[in-house]
Amino acid sequence: MSKNIFTELSDAMASAAEQAGNSTVLVDARRRFPASGIAFAKDMILTADHVVERDEDIKVILGDGTELTARLAGRDPGTDLAVLKLDSASAVPAVVAKTPARVGQFVLAIGRPSKRGIESSFGTVNAIGGPVRTGRGGMLESFIKTDVVSYPGFSGGPLINGEGQVFGINTSGFGSGGAITIPADAAWKVAETLAKHGKIKRGYLGIRSQTVNIPEDGQSQLKRKQENGLLIVGLEAESPAGNGGLMVGDILVGVAGEAIEHHDELFTRLSGDVVGKSTPLDVLRGGRLEVVNVVVGER
């Protein structure tokens, strides 16, 4: 007798949990309550920043039960992410999903909150959104919202698809009304930067601005469909924007070729590699599109 669809689904999700469990670790870096983490390299663990309370002598237990010592390699409270460096390159790196999560997909949240092994929670993707302020001073370009139950110790563990591939990293550091996951592509970028530099650079221009509709004559000059921009209403003294040539009355519509329509998008774009570098800003000035190169300051 052939298996019914529910048995097949159940078996598939159990296999997915087992596969992801190989890369899901226990992270003991705070008093009383261990948490979870994801191996993104053989010697690197990605976890949630809020579960890391010390820099040294961090205990990590791998999927095969091996207990290792780790140290904090970098952290970014703004995105609630931290990277740990293992004293041995023994971890099994996680496999990231090739396609992003979609609303309605079945997912599993995986955690390793104790030495007993992995735990899982089943649910569906409720929404894909962003940008979103994390409540910890940072900004994410996107997030995944699910109805999985995030049990104690699940923070830092993966959200996976039916093949055991990682959609993102679970965090309880921000969000309400459902479990929040940081998408894998965004999390891995942060992780790679933290592993290299120990922190995430965040930039600023030193402007005061408000969202406005772009006039029709301005829209006709853009090579993309864009309705809004940021009207500059003030400049800080000796600000990067002022020193670079931006003026009150300019409408900022792009940073390094990427459209800017709202303050949250500007916050997101002014981070990482652009900080400290001359960056082209697209502005509408007197109805004409101009490019102004500004050296982005560091907060």
Mark where each language-model region is.
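Gly/Ser-enriched beta-turn/beta-hairpin loop segments
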Residues: 73-79, 128-144, 193-201, 212-229
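Active-site region of chymotrypsin-like
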Residues: 21-23, 82, 86-93, 119-177, ...
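Conserved PDZ fold ligand-binding element
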Residues: 42-46, 167, 241-264
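Conserved active-site neighborhood of the chymotrypsin/trypsin-like protease fold
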Residues: 3-5, 21-119, 152, 175, ...
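Residue-level recognition of beta-strand microenvironments
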Residues: 42, 73-75, 128, 162, ...
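PDZ/PDZ-like domain micro-motif
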Residues: 153-159, 214-223, 236-254, 269
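C-terminal cap/linker of serine protease catalytic domains
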Residues: 1-17, 113, 166-227, 263, ...
